[in-house]
């Protein structure tokens, strides 16, 4: 790569969902010749733009936020319907494109399930030694998020297994951008990293639409209709994790029997 850049005829872009893993395996990186940019699914604001929410409406939202005032009720109702749509479609570019082309949720789910199948192929291809562990963890994300405290319980994989045996599999899922670990902190005080627990965490999907695609068929329409019988906790919490992560913040949460729980704790200067 260094030679090609120095030759100067072209500029090069390398891309891939697992490029970060490949780069970490390099013995030396060509410092000064490569800029690394991490890409994310479309966030909620970008999704608003994709489905045609006008700049005027977006400005109204920002003004309301900055002035600590409620958004107009009609605007609020419309935006919440788009939020529920985002819970189903998510932000994967191919999925959003399919929705805009077809306006068909069944077509959307077909693309999402194809992406999930490709994840399994990538797991087997890039880490054959740990593929069973990684696949077990990945497949356990939806039911673990549906549990009361949403914390990932390692014993649900194997009662006798130790965290150290699975740790590299969690790291692999994080480094590939497939999953978003959110670590427990002993206290919601800065710096959060100093009180981070190594093995107490929640594990979210990197895209809320892919999480919704793992649910039973028919749930998607109930989400769109804001069905009061559905527990929206897991899917909304996944949405927040995705938003916080794509804006550059590390993911933490705080839980205390005496003080209560903070679903997310953000270190912001």
Where do the PLM segments sit?
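Accessory nucleic acid-recognition modules appended to NTPase machines
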Residues: 97-268
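Conserved Walker B catalytic segment
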Residues: 1-13
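Structural recognition of the conserved hydrophobic beta-strand(s) that form the central parallel beta-sheet
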Residues: 11-17, 38, 47
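Interdomain motor-coupling "hinge/lid" segment immediately C-terminal to the ATP-binding subdomain
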Residues: 23-146
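Hydrophobic/aromatic beta-strand patches that form the interior of the parallel beta-sheet core
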Residues: 13, 35-37, 87, 204, ...
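Conserved nucleotide-binding/hydrolysis micro-motifs of P-loop NTPases
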Residues: 18-22, 41-45, 186, 210
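Glycine-rich, phosphate-binding/catalytic loops in enzymes
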Residues: 2-5, 29-32, 222
């Amino acid at each position: 790569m260094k030679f090609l850049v120095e030759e100067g005829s072209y500029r090069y872009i390398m891309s891939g969902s697992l490029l970060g893993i490949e780069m970490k395996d390099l013995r030396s990186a060509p410092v000064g010749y490569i800029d690394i940019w991490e890409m994310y699914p479309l966030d909620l604001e970008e999704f608003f733009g994709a489905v045609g929410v006008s700049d005027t409406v977006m400005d109204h939202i920002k003004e309301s936020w900055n002035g600590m005032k409620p958004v107009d009720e009609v605007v609020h109702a419309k935006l919440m319907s788009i939020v529920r749509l985002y819970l189903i479609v998510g932000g994967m570019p191919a999925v959003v494109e399919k929705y805009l082309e077809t306006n068909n949720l069944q077509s959307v789910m077909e693309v999402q399930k194809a992406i999930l199948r490709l994840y399994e192929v990538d797991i087997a291809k890039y880490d054959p030694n740990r593929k069973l562990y990684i696949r077990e963890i990945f497949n356990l994300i939806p039911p673990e998020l549906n549990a009361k405290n949403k914390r990932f319980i390692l014993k649900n994989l194997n009662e006798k297994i130790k965290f150290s045996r699975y740790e590299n599999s969690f790291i692999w899922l994080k480094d590939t951008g497939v999953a978003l670990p959110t670590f427990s902190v002993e206290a919601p005080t800065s710096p959060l990293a100093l009180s981070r627990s190594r093995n107490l965490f929640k594990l979210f999907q990197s895209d809320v639409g892919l999480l919704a695609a793992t649910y039973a068929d028919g749930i998607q329409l109930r989400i769109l209709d804001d069905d009061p019988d559905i527990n929206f906790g897991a899917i909304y919490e996944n949405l927040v994790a995705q938003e916080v992560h794509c804006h550059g913040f590390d993911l933490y949460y705080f839980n205390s029997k005496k003080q209560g729980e903070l679903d997310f704790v953000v270190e912001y200067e």
